[in-house]
Amino acid sequence: MGSMSIWHWVIVAVIVMLLFGRGKVSDLMGDVAKGIKAFKKGMAEDETPPAVQAAPPPAEPVRTIPHATETSPGTAIPASHLPGGERKPV
C-alpha cells in the first residue's frame, strides 16, 4: 500500500467521469478557473493604495474626574487609609 501509481489515478479519473459526466466536470473546472481569476483580481486591487484617504473624525476632548482619595503634593494621607494608623506626607 505504497504511493498511488499513475494507473490508480487513471481509474479514479474514469470513475469520476462516469459518475458526473463530461459536461458537469468541465463546468466544475470552469467555475474553479473563474474563482481563481476573481481571487487574483481581488488580490491585485488590494495592493494598490487608495488615492485619497478620508480625514479621521475629530477626537472628543478627554474629561478627567478626580477621585475623592487624591491629595495634592505635601498633604498628609488620613490615618484611616494607612496600615498601622501612621500619618506620612505624600
Curated annotation (Swiss-Prot):
Source organism, top-level taxon: Bacteria
Transmembrane domains' residue ranges: 1-21
Principal location: membrane
Record-linked InterPro entries: TatA/B/E, TatA/E
Region (Disordered): 44-90
GO cellular component, one term: TAT protein transport complex
Alphabetical list of Gene3D superfamilies matching this protein: 1.20.5.3310
Protein topology in the membrane: Single-pass membrane protein
GO BP: protein transport by the Tat complex
Alphabetical UniProt keywords: Cell inner membrane, Cell membrane, Membrane, Protein transport, Translocation, Transmembrane, Transmembrane helix, Transport
GO molecular function, one term: protein transmembrane transporter activity
Family from the record: Belongs to the TatA/E family.
Function: Part of the twin-arginine translocation (Tat) system that transports large folded proteins containing a characteristic twin-arginine motif in their signal peptide across membranes. TatA could form the protein-conducting channel of the Tat system.
Subunit description: The Tat system comprises two distinct complexes: a TatABC complex, containing multiple copies of TatA, TatB and TatC subunits, and a separate TatA complex, containing only TatA subunits. Substrates initially bind to the TatABC complex, which probably triggers association of the separate TatA complex to form the active translocon.
Protein name: Sec-independent protein translocase protein TatA
Species of origin: Methylobacterium radiotolerans (strain ATCC 27329 / DSM 1819 / JCM 2831 / NBRC 15690 / NCIMB 10815 / 0-1)
